[in-house]
Amino acid sequence: MSWQGSDPGRSRVRLRATLQGLLLGWISVATAAGGAPDSGAAVGPVPEALRTALKLDPFYQKHLDVEGLPVVGSAKVSDHALAEAAWILRGMLPGRGDLLRAMAKNKVRLVVMAFNEYTTDVPEHRRLNSKVFWDRRARGVGGTPQDPVVSCGEENLLGYPGDPYSTESILIHEFAHSIHKNGLRTVDPGFDERLRAAYDNAKARGLWPKTYAITEPGEYWAEGVQSWFDANRENDALHCHVNTRAEVKEYDPKLAKLCAEVFGDHPWRWRKPADRPASERAHLAGFDPARSPRFRWRESPRRCASSGPSG
C-alpha cells in the first residue's frame, strides 16, 4: 500500500516548493521590465501572487516593487512614504540588481509603518517579547534569515514633526542589516570573513570607542553604511564624530573599503526630503510637509494599556 501521498513531511516539502516557485515567478514578472535605477513606480494593491508566495497577512494593503523586492504597508501608510522608501533603496544600490534579487528570493520585504502604527502592529513582529519596549523604542527592525522582514516608520522617511530619529535614516541602518544577512551571504559568501577582519582591526586600534558601532560586527557594518550615505548621527552617547563618507574613509579605511565594494563610491547621499532639490523629489509630487501629522510615542496601544487609566 502506498503511503507517500499522506506523508506530512513530503506534503510540507511540496508546499514549500510551490510557494518558492510562486515567489520566483513573481520576481521574474516584477523585474522583466528593467528600468533605470531611479525610475519610479506607482503604489498599488498587494499582488495576489506575492501575497500567496510570502503568506502576507491581510494587514498589508499597499505595495511597491524594487527589482522584485516588495515594499509594503497597511492601508494607513502614506503612498509618499512607500515611494520614498523605494527611492532610497534605488539610491543605495544602483547597479546591484543581483543583490536586490537575491534578497527578494530570500523572502525579504520592507514594511513601512504608518506614523500611528508601532513595531508590534507589524504582523511578523507581533511575536516579539516585551511589546511595550519595542513599541516605545524601535521605529525599525533589520530582519534575519529566519525572519526576513525589514521595517521603518513613515515619519522618519518623510520628516514628520516628532520624529524621534530626525537626524538619521532608520531605513538605511535597518536595510544594511538585511543586505548583510539576507543578501551578501548569498551573493558574496566571503563577505562575513572580511567584515570580521575589519571589525577586529577596528577594535585592536581602539576605533569607535564606546559607540554602538563597536558592539558587534553587524552593528559595525550597519552604522558604517549609515555614515557612508551621510545618514548617521554624531557626537552623542552612542556615536563619535564620524557620520559622513569622507570621515569613514579617513577614520576607518577598512570599513570604507567594504562599503565601496558593496555600494560603489557614487555621489548619491541621503538627505531629508525638505533638504533636497526638486529634481530629487519628483516621486513625492503632491506631498505637502506643512500638512504632515505629528508622531507621538504615547499613542502606542500597548503602552497606553500598560500605563493603566489616567486619573
Model-identified regions with their sequence ranges:
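N-terminal secretory signal peptides that target proteins for export/translocation
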Residues: 1-15
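Alpha-helical and His/Cys-centered functional microenvironments
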Residues: 8, 24, 177
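Bacterial N-terminal signal peptides
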Residues: 18-30
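N-terminal low-structure segments adjacent to metalloprotease catalytic domains
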Residues: 32-129, 265-311
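Metalloprotease/metallohydrolase-associated module, dominated by Zn2+-dependent proteases
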Residues: 47, 55, 72, 128-155, ...
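Acidic/His-rich structured neighborhood in mature extracellular/periplasmic domains
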Residues: 59, 68-69, 77-200, 238-241
